[in-house]
A protein has these predicted regions:
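Residues in the helix-turn-helix
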Residues: 39, 50
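A short pre-motif secondary-structure segment
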Residues: 27-28
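Short helix-coil-helix linker/hinge
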Residues: 17-24
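Short, Lys/Arg-enriched C-terminal cap helix and immediately downstream tail that follows
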Residues: 59-66
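Short, Lys/Arg-enriched N-terminal segment that forms or immediately precedes the first helix
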Residues: 2-17
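Short alpha-helical "recognition helix" segments of helix-turn-helix
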Residues: 40-44
Length: 66
């Protein structure tokens, strides 16, 4: 599952239904714009390991909703 493959209506649905934390939502929005995990870590000034944790949490929430 690639977040950037979702269409806008699906992205809006997931934003509304997944109850993302602020960090998770920021990650979700950046991935929707095709940013890589490395780019995201540089933008939000966290380690790549932290971004990997965010990715896992976001994907888990998406799978629960879908």
């Amino acid at each position: 599952m690639k977040i950037y493959d979702f269409v806008n209506s699906e992205l809006e649905f997931l934003r509304a239904e997944c109850n993302f934390s602020d960090e998770e939502l920021e990650y979700f929005n950046l991935r929707a714009k095709h940013y890589s995990n490395l780019q995201i870590s540089l933008i939000v000034n966290v380690s790549e390991a932290k971004v990997s944790v965010l990715a896992k949490r976001v994907k888990t929430k998406i799978k629960k909703v879908l």
